[in-house]
C-alpha cells in the first residue's frame, strides 16, 4: 500500500533541503528588498515600528512584480496561516481570517529566512504527523469555500506554492547576481 502522506511530506522535504533552503544562503538586506522594476510589491515599514506585506488578499490583474522579501513572506505565511488554522488554533476562524495572520512581518533578510524556516518546520512537522484518515478528511468550515476538499489537497496546494515561489526566488537571486553584467 502506498503511503501518500509520506510522499507529500518527502516531496516538500526534498524541495526544501535540495533547492529552496540552499538558495537563501548569503541573502543580504539589499537583495531581500531589491526592486528590479518600478512599483514592486514588497514588505515596507508600517509606520508603527514593524513591517507590512503589500497586497495581502488582493488579486489585481496583471499581478505586480514582487521582491524577494514579498515572495519569502508569501511562502512563509502560506504555511503559517494553514498551520494556525488547522493545527494550533482551536477557534473556528477559517483559513482566510486575518486572525491567523502572523503577528509581525520580517523586514530584513536574516529575519525573513528565520521566519520562513520556522513556518516551514511547523507546517512540515504537523503534516508529517497526519494519519491516512486525517489526510482524507474534508477541511470542513475552516477551509472556507474549500470545505469539502481533503487535507491532502491543501498539502498539495501548499507544496505547489512553495515550489512555484521558491523557483521564483532562485531566479530573482540569479538576476540580482548578474544585474550588472554586460553582454559580450
Predicted regions and their residues:
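Acidic/histidine-rich alpha-helical segments that form the ligand environment
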Residues: 100-136, 152-163
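Short, contiguous alpha-helical
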Residues: 3-102, 140-184
Amino acid at each position: 500500500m502506498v503511503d501518500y502522506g509520506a510522499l507529500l511530506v518527502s516531496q516538500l522535504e526534498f524541495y526544501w533541503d535540495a533547492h529552496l533552503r540552499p538558495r537563501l544562503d548569503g541573502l543580504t538586506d539589499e537583495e531581500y528588498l531589491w526592486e528590479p522594476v518600478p512599483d514592486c510589491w514588497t514588505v515596507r515599514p508600517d509606520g508603527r515600528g514593524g513591517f507590512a506585506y503589500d497586497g495581502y488578499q488582493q488579486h489585481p490583474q496583471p499581478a505586480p512584480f514582487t521582491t524577494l522579501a514579498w515572495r519569502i513572506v508569501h511562502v512563509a505565511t502560506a504555511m503559517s496561516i494553514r498551520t494556525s488554522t488547522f493545527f494550533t488554533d482551536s477557534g473556528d476562524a477559517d483559513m482566510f481570517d486575518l486572525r491567523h495572520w502572523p503577528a509581525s512581518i520580517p523586514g530584513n533578510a536574516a529575519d525573513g529566512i528565520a521566519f520562513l524556516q520556522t513556518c516551514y518546520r511547523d507546517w512540515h512537522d504537523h503534516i508529517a504527523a497526519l494519519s491516512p484518515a486525517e489526510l482524507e478528511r474534508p477541511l470542513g468550515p475552516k477551509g472556507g469555500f474549500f470545505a469539502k476538499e481533503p487535507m491532502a489537497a491543501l498539502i498539495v496546494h501548499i507544496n505547489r506554492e512553495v515550489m512555484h515561489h521558491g523557483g521564483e526566488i532562485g531566479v530573482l537571486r540569479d538576476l540580482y547576481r548578474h544585474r550588472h553584467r554586460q553582454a559580450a
